Amino acid sequence: MTGDDYKFGRASYVSISDGSSKADVVISDHVWIYGALQSQNHGQIRLGKYTRVGVDSKLQSVESIIIDDYTTIADNVVIADNNNHPVSPSFRLYMRMTSDTDESRRWKHSAHAPIYIGKNCWIGQNARINKGVTIGDNCIVAANSVVTKSAPANCIIAGNPARIVKTDIDKVEAPTTCKGYNDYVR
């Protein structure tokens, strides 16, 4: 873990287990974490500068989760680059008959694919981002959405399963009455 001025909330934690190391989790400058970062089998987690991870949110990686700069992840969001379980009924049954520490319970036995979330995105409360998804810069994922497919930059994604409901949000006018905003954008 690297970076300056990062902050961990009260119930937050970083879990580095099953073949992963501290080098697999990279936290950039000015990051606030109030949820959990979980890495197994060298699963990479990269948080860009000024990223926020909300209360009870979980980033679970066995491959790669990259969250670019200035992205906000609201409370109770799950971002998992794996299924957390195998699909095979017989293997799932076997897992249930083993101890919690048995090797069969590791995420590497489930399907997995990398996740990338671009710059300046907002991931709404209770959303879920599934394996293999890429979300472009400046996107909003609505609360309670389940994202199973990638989305281009500058759009709003909503629903279960999530779909693009608005595009070109980079063309939406910002409020000019916000104190300090006009100085900020110059």
Model-assigned labels for residue ranges:
Residues 131, 149:
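Conserved coupling/switch loop of ABC ATPases
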